[in-house]
Amino acid sequence: MATQKQDEFLLETEQTRTKPPPLYKVLLLNDDFTPMDFVIVVLQKFFGMDRERATRVMLQVHREGMGVCGVFPKDVAATKVEQVVAFARQHQHPLACVMEEN
């Protein structure tokens, strides 16, 4: 009798566990107008990258058309996209930043 209650408790515990929220990649997209140095500043300011890593990501964006800035929960990713786009517009650059499910 005790094992049946333990089994029911374990079953309930397993059913109530939630899976972690999906993560989203934040991507920068290449354009022909935004200066490379500005992209490096964005990567350092909003994604906490050191200059070397920011330069590598910037070159990936330049050569491959896009680069991953980081992977975050949905709300954090959306905030970062908004911040980057607003900062770029404030400095009159057309830099595009998007997010996609990881």
Curated annotation (Swiss-Prot):
PANTHER family, A to Z: ATP-DEPENDENT CLP PROTEASE ADAPTER PROTEIN CLPS (PTHR33473:SF19), ATP-DEPENDENT CLP PROTEASE ADAPTER PROTEIN CLPS1, CHLOROPLASTIC (PTHR33473)
Record-given protein name: ATP-dependent Clp protease adapter protein ClpS
SUPFAM superfamilies: ClpS-like
Family to which the UniProt record says this protein belongs: Belongs to the ClpS family.
Any single biological process term in GO: protein catabolic process
Function comment: Involved in the modulation of the specificity of the ClpAP-mediated ATP-dependent protein degradation.
Domain of life: Bacteria
InterPro entries: ClpS, ClpS_core, Ribosomal_bL12_C/ClpS-like
Subunit-structure text: Binds to the N-terminal domain of the chaperone ClpA.
Taxonomic classification: Bacteria, Pseudomonadati, Pseudomonadota, Betaproteobacteria, Rhodocyclales
